[in-house]
From Swiss-Prot:
GO terms for biological process: negative regulation of DNA-templated transcription. Keywords: 2Fe-2S, DNA-binding, Iron, Iron-sulfur, Metal-binding, Repressor, Transcription, Transcription regulation. One of its GO terms (cellular component) is cytosol. This is HTH-type transcriptional repressor NsrR. Binds 1 [2Fe-2S] cluster per subunit. Nitric oxide-sensitive repressor of genes involved in protecting the cell against nitrosative stress. May require iron for activity. It comes from the Bacteria.
């Protein structure tokens, strides 16, 4: 299973915000510059993360974006559930005539649940705290 670029960059944006000194705001432009992703794509990602409460956007001259929760309260599995379309196969009888007898969807569903359960063991804080090599790569001080 490969995560979509939407989820990938959503996680990266959260990692960047969690790496900043506490309380420091950033901008969508800053995040796009760090990762080299289109601004339009990042705006959509940040909007969804904001609707889910993972990011807070502050308007105005001194505005920007920052984490909406503490990094230790953001489970990676929850973020993936929010951003990632997790249906691995299209099992409607319109597309597949073996749907009534097929057990593949159930097997894939169990595999996805195991994947997400493992990701639930990690918070955003686990990925960024005391990670000096990450801070250097992100040019965060």
């Amino acid at each position: 299973m490969q995560l979509t670029s939407f989820t990938d960059y959503g996680l990266r944006a959260l990692i960047y915000m969690a790496s900043l000194p506490e309380g420091r705001m950033t901008s969508i432009s800053e995040v796009t510059d760090v990762y080299g992703v289109s601004r339009n794509h990042m705006v959509k990602i940040i909007n969804q993360l904001s609707r889910a409460g993972y990011v807070t956007a502050v308007r105005g001259k001194n505005g920007g974006i920052r984490l909406g929760k503490s990094a230790s309260a953001i489970r990676i599995g929850d973020v993936v559930r929010e951003l990632e379309p997790l249906s691995l196969v299209n099992c409607s009888s319109e597309f597949c005539h073996i749907t009534p007898a097929c057990r593949l969807k159930q097997a894939l569903s169990k595999a996805v649940q195991s994947f997400l359960t493992e990701l639930d063991n990690y918070t955003l804080a686990d990925l960024v705290e005391e990670n000096q090599p990450l801070y250097k790569l992100l040019l965060v001080e």
